[in-house]
C-alpha cells in the first residue's frame, strides 16, 4: 500500500505554494524596465545625496544579541501550549518540558559566559 495518496491535497498545496513565488519573480524580471548606469549603483538615502561612505560594517554583537532573543522567543512559543494544558498532560510531559527548559538554561549560561548578552 502506498500511503502518500492520502496526502494528495498537501502535495498540491506544496506544489502551488512553491511555484507561486517563482512565477512572481519570473514575471517581475520579464516585465521590469532595464536601466543600467552609474545612478543605479549609488546607495539611496531618503532621496538625498549620500553623505560620506554609505557602506558601513554591521557589528556582529547585534546579530548575536538578536539570535539569543529569537531563541528565547521560540522557547516561549513552545512552552505556552504546554502551560495551558499542564493539568491534562500529566507527569511525563512535565518531565519532557523540564528537560527542554534545562537544555535552554544550559544554552543561556553558555551565551552569558561567551558574552553574547553584554551590550557594551
Swiss-Prot record:
Belongs to the complex I subunit 3 family. Gene3D superfamilies: NADH:ubiquinone/plastoquinone oxidoreductase, chain 3 (1.20.58.1610). The chain crosses the membrane at residues 7-27, 64-84, 88-108. NDH is composed of at least 16 different subunits, 5 of which are encoded in the nucleus. Its main location: plastid. It is a multi-pass membrane protein. This is NAD(P)H-quinone oxidoreductase subunit 3, chloroplastic. It is found in: Plastid, Chloroplast thylakoid membrane. One of its GO terms (molecular function) is quinone binding. InterPro entries: NAD(P)H_OxRDtase_bac/plastid (IPR023043), NADH_UbQ/plastoQ_OxRdtase_su3 (IPR000440), NDAH_ubi_oxred_su3_sf (IPR038430).
Amino acid at each position: 500500500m502506498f500511503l502518500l495518496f492520502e496526502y494528495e491535497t498537501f502535495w498540491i498545496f506544496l506544489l502551488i505554494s512553491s511555484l507561486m513565488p517563482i512565477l512572481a519573480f519570473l514575471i517581475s524580471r520579464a516585465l521590469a524596465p532595464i536601466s543600467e548606469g552609474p545612478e543605479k549603483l549609488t546607495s539611496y538615502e531618503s532621496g538625498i545625496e549620500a553623505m560620506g561612505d554609505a557602506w558601513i560594517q554591521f557589528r556582529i554583537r547585534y546579530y548575536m544579541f538578536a539570535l539569543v532573543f529569537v531563541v528565547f522567543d521560540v522557547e516561549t512559543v513552545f512552552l505556552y501550549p504546554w502551560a495551558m494544558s499542564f493539568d491534562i498532560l500529566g507527569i511525563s510531559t512535565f518531565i519532557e518540558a523540564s528537560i527542554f527548559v534545562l537544555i535552554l538554561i544550559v544554552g543561556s549560561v553558555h551565551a552569558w559566559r561567551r558574552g553574547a548578552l553584554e551590550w557594551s
